[in-house]
Swiss-Prot record:
It comes from Burkholderia cenocepacia (strain HI2424). GO terms for molecular function: ribosomal large subunit binding. Keywords: Cytoplasm, Protein biosynthesis. HAMAP family: RRF. The keyword Protein biosynthesis applies. It is found in: Cytoplasm. This is Ribosome-recycling factor. It comes from the Bacteria. One of its GO terms (cellular component) is cytosol. It holds the Pfam family RRF. InterPro entries: Ribosome_recyc_fac, Ribosome_recyc_fac_dom, RRF_sf.
Amino acid sequence: MSVADVKKGVEQKMQRSIEAFKNDLAKIRTGRAHTGLLDHVQVDYYGSMVPISQVANLTLVDARTIGVQPWEKNMVAKVEKAIREADLGLNPATTGDLIRVPMPALTEERRRELTKVVKSEGETAKVAIRNLRRDANEALKKLVKDKEISEDDERRASDDVQKLTDKHVAEIDKLVQTKEAEIMTV
């Protein structure tokens, strides 16, 4: 293993942490409708659980309503049930074969709770990034101990790892701020 391998590995892992954090943020409901909110809803399709996007077309009817059009008429009730049981606080209404999912307006108290959740998720993501930094620095120290690199090389590499850490932590902060602003916008 070389310094380049360590740096490349830690950068890939940090990027995956950021992607996981973005997915977590997408699950947090804001006042506005977006189809990504239903991405994690699983529907019982002839005995197997599949993502809602594989059995229905998701569209935005307006700023506060998602339209869900199942491809098979017999799936309407199952899709509606899956949305209702997804623990998103949504109450779908069916008209014919179109399921309308209105987004209830968020109360001020609920908005504040959601911003706390976003901050907490952000802190968790930062801890994950810092843990990756620690692992990379330990790998670099092991390379020095095994006499594969000099201490100067290790110092330079750990500075590079720190720069990567700072960059990814700043990205998390930016994502948190954006999501908080989205939640607090009435």
